[in-house]
């Protein structure tokens, strides 16, 4: 039974600048009878700038109550930034958008992420042997493009190139597509 409670606030400072803040509070997440993720509140604050109708830059600072593995020097604070150009609209076939993002987020600030880098076990797929135990966080970039194929049908392609923010022995590249 996984529950996450949160509060997200957004404020348009003016026509170009906007601010956001959020607070997230999870209940402990269990993997069978074992606690897979402890309760750890996360706070975020971000600032965005709209250059024009098509281009937006947004950066966010994230901080957790405590690091996941403090005894190993894992961090509890990080940041992320994203630059968006245009953007596909579900009600506008033929519309498209692209973005680039950079993340430096310790495991303590991530509850779930598309890249699936923040895992507690990683395996060598050739031998199915465990390589690393411990949470990794994410540090690296993501690029993506989306295109509206038909009304309410959007295709997306994302590429991730990450290493662990807390454990840089973990590296991953991944392509992700959606329709």
Where do the language-model regions lie?
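Contiguous mid-protein beta-loop-alpha structural module that forms a pocket-lining wall or clamp
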Residues: 1-12, 24
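Outer-membrane beta-barrel pore domains
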Residues: 12, 16-18, 23-179
